[in-house]
Amino acid sequence: MRLTVLCAVCLLPGSLALPLPQEAGGMSELQWEQAQDYLKRFYLYDSETKNANSLEAKLKEMQKFFGLPITGMLNSRVIEIMQKPRCGVPDVAEYSLFPNSPKWTSKVVTYRIVSYTRDLPHITVDRLVSKALNMWGKEIPLHFRKVVWGTADIMIGFARGAHGDSYPFDGPGNTLAHAFAPGTGLGGDAHFDEDERWTDGSSLGINFLYAATHELGHSLGMGHSSDPNAVMYPTYGNGDPQNFKLSQDDIKGIQKLYGKRSNSRKK
């Protein structure tokens, strides 16, 4: 099951200087520009060389993350992955936490749904958000409490285009949603693009439970995983709703951050 859910954190601006080599056959100018933009947003620096200006180093990081041959060259497979809808958080190997491992210090985390999609009944959105949070909550010593007014730790909503957080949505496809790591202000908040077609899994469109579970993982402090079976894998795909669950990689990551729930099932 591939999961491409979309989220955003405070991404650092970066400059791209060196041209990208490519395999025989060439790429269109649009693909070239898309590749540079993709690497700029999702691979902020090379973990070994720390060369923030080397596009080739960034491309190698991407190829390593997705299990591709590490050539540092653009090819059709790389472009195919770059064109998939995905989350706005940079990629790392296996499970990861945000820099400095931000997390909620209170054992009770509040959440509020401030706006809803037109695609689903309010009661369905409420149920799926609760289910997504409980998937994480049953593994860690946190409790989630819904509030209906005021400021909650996690503010959840649907919006189109620019919506006040410097990360405007881009219409159908591409960026589906974004979320912020635990903290003050926007910290923990999760936003979903209302230009998408959201479903409960019973019709064509983006399965909201999949997206919400991924985004709320970010709201709890989780980064991306390179494990294709993980909820925190950066790309989206419709799997079997009846068998949707956290992977061992997801559980290992969230318990690294918060510890195990006393009644969490043994692994």
Curated annotation (Swiss-Prot):
Localisation per UniProt entry: Secreted, Extracellular space, Extracellular matrix
SUPFAM superfamilies tied to this protein: Metalloproteases ('zincins'), catalytic domain, PGBD-like
Catalysed reactions, as listed in the record: Cleavage of 14-Ala-|-Leu-15 and 16-Tyr-|-Leu-17 in B chain of insulin. No action on collagen types I, II, IV, V. Cleaves gelatin chain alpha2(I) > alpha1(I)
Cofactor field: Ca(2+); Zn(2+)
Propeptide residues, chain positions: 18-94
GO cellular component: extracellular exosome; extracellular matrix; extracellular region; extracellular space
Ranges in a coiled coil: none
Motif (Cysteine switch): 85-92
Binding site for Zn(2+) 2: 87, 214, 218, 224
Protein residues bound to Zn(2+) 1: 163, 165, 178, 191
Short name of one Pfam family: Peptidase_M10
Binding site for Ca(2+) 2: 170-171, 173, 175, 193, 196
S-adenosyl-L-methionine keyword on record: no
TM stretches of this protein: none
Cited Gene3D superfamilies: Collagenase (Catalytic Domain)
Positions of Ca(2+) 1 binding: 153, 185, 187, 189
Keywords tagged on the record: Calcium, Collagen degradation, Extracellular matrix, Hydrolase, Metal-binding, Metalloprotease, Protease, Secreted, Signal, Zinc, Zymogen
Purpose: Degrades casein, gelatins of types I, III, IV, and V, and fibronectin. Activates procollagenase.
Family to which the UniProt record says this protein belongs: Belongs to the peptidase M10A family.
Name of the protein: Matrilysin
Species of the source: Homo sapiens (Human)
This protein's encoding gene: MMP7
